[in-house]
Amino acid sequence: MAEAWRYSAQGVAVAVRVTPRGDRDEIDGLETLSDGRPVVKLRVRAIADGGEANRAVIELLAKALGVPKRNVRLLSGATSRQKQIAIDGDPKSLGETLRQLTAAKPAG
């Protein structure tokens, strides 16, 4: 499966699919969308109202990747379950951490 993130000089851009109102905040592996694009599956407890789920996604990714929240920003998908998230930092290190976090769960 292809990676759900792209590398840049500043860090990585990650394609995610978010499930709000989950039973916990977690990275839930990789998934291939119907159009063939890979995404990282995320669950957050927050509801999708007033940006709460978006804030929860940023907090979850920052904590999981060990970067400050200010290094994680929403690129697109503010009102959609599918989002593009930019994470600033060392691209190689971020990519390896994402690989480890998503490899723990099989693709669905």
From Swiss-Prot:
Cellular component annotations (GO), alphabetically ordered: cytoplasm
SUPFAM superfamilies tied to this protein: YggU-like
SMART domains in alphabetical order: DUF167
Gene3D superfamilies, alphabetized: YggU-like
Family: Belongs to the UPF0235 family.
Protein name: UPF0235 protein RPB_0109
Phylogenetic classification of the source organism: Bacteria, Pseudomonadati, Pseudomonadota, Alphaproteobacteria, Hyphomicrobiales
